[in-house]
């Protein structure tokens, strides 16, 4: 068959044109039933959306953890137990584009050992379709904000299952509730160790709640992080699920607004008052954020530090905006890369 290539992935599929995708099709009624699709086959994009809880992601690989989705792993492979499997739908080729494999590769992940390639339990082929992917994308309006998040930041859309999963994970890890299974205890300890490195909280809440939300936001922004491992390691608690959960959206909104103000501070650096190095303390988050900027003066770092201090006093932007309005008007935006950089700066330790 013809080699199918594209500039980017679309939920483990490739977009051939504005309406058509090429995607692997798994002939597996058992898997279809688990995903509530009511068909004899499953598109890889549907499986990707179910596992991640999001759509419109630029990914061609999928990791599935046994602790949460052992039934899906069994339906795909016939394996009775493992830690996780990985599916690779294609590869990057010389011209920078992506090629769809004729048959996706399936691997058993074995800790530090070399992954072992597996055979598919059922037939897999390639289909071209304009069938819409999983629907029920959430389009709720975010809380009132001084700045509007651009569409480029919201290109990855979450399904209700993402919000439901995050709601119980946020509660379980944030409150250390009902954590008995070894897998869950291990991920809790791993998160707790990394959470202690956080420099600034982006939302009111405890250290673990902030860490979990930050990982979920980084995942939706397409950045590397722990969210896939977290969501694959904490079993569902239906009684704690809520599709109305929005704490991560509030955090993303807060992070974007701070990044906007930080960018404005740098743009208008000549309008800032001169400061004496010996008299000022600079927040490490500000230092990390401005590392990629050329010659950010001390006045920029001090002003950004003050913004962080004012924001974290009440977790709103009223005082911070009043403060910077003495020197300039905020007239810039922030990119996805800016927001990711700020998230990572907030999570970074010494």
Curated annotation (Swiss-Prot):
Q: Which domain of life is it from?
A: Viruses
Q: Which protein family is it in?
A: Belongs to the herpesviridae U59/UL88 family.
Q: Which organism is it from?
A: Human herpesvirus 6A (strain Uganda-1102) (HHV-6 variant A)
Q: Pfam families this protein is in?
A: Herpes_U59 (PF04529)
| Highest classification ranks of the organism | Viruses, Duplodnaviria, Heunggongvirae, Peploviricota, Herviviricetes
Q: InterPro entries in the record, alphabetically?
A: Herpes_U59/UL88
* The protein's name in its UniProt record: Protein U59
């Amino acid at each position: 068959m013809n080699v199918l290539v594209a500039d980017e992935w679309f939920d483990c599929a490739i977009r051939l044109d504005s309406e058509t995708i090429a995607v692997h099709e798994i002939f597996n009624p058992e898997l279809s039933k688990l995903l509530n699709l009511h068909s004899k086959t499953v598109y890889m994009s549907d499986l990707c959306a179910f596992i991640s809880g999001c759509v419109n992601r630029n990914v061609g690989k999928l990791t599935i953890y046994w602790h949460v989705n052992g039934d899906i792993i069994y339906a795909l492979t016939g394996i009775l137990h493992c830690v996780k499997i990985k599916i690779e739908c294609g590869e990057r080729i010389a011209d920078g584009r992506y090629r769809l494999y004729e048959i996706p590769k399936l691997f058993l992940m074995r800790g530090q050992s070399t992954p072992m390639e597996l055979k598919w339990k059922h037939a897999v082929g390639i289909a071209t379709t304009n069938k819409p992917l999983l629907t029920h994308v959430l389009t709720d309006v975010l809380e009132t904000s001084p700045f509007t998040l651009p569409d480029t930041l919201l290109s990855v859309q979450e399904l209700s299952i993402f919000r439901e999963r995050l709601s119980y994970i946020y509660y379980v890890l944030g409150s250390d509730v009902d954590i008995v299974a070894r897998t869950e205890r291990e991920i809790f300890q791993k998160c707790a160790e990394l959470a202690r490195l956080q420099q600034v909280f982006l939302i009111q809440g405890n250290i673990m709640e902030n860490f979990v939300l930050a990982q979920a936001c980084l995942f939706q922004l397409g950045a590397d992080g722990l969210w896939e491992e977290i969501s694959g390691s904490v079993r569902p608690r239906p009684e704690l699920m809520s599709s109305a959960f929005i704490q991560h959206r509030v955090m993303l909104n807060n992070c974007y607004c701070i990044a906007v103000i930080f960018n404005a501070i740098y743009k208008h650096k000549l309008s800032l008052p001169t400061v004496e190095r010996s008299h000022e303390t600079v927040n490490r988050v500000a230092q990390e954020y401005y590392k990629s900027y050329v010659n950010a003066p001390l006045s920029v770092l001090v002003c950004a530090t003050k913004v962080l201090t004012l924001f974290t006093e009440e977790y709103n932007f009223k005082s911070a905006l009043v403060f910077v309005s003495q020197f300039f008007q905020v007239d810039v935006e922030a990119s996805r890369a800016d927001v990711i950089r700020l998230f990572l700066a907030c999570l970074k330790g010494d």
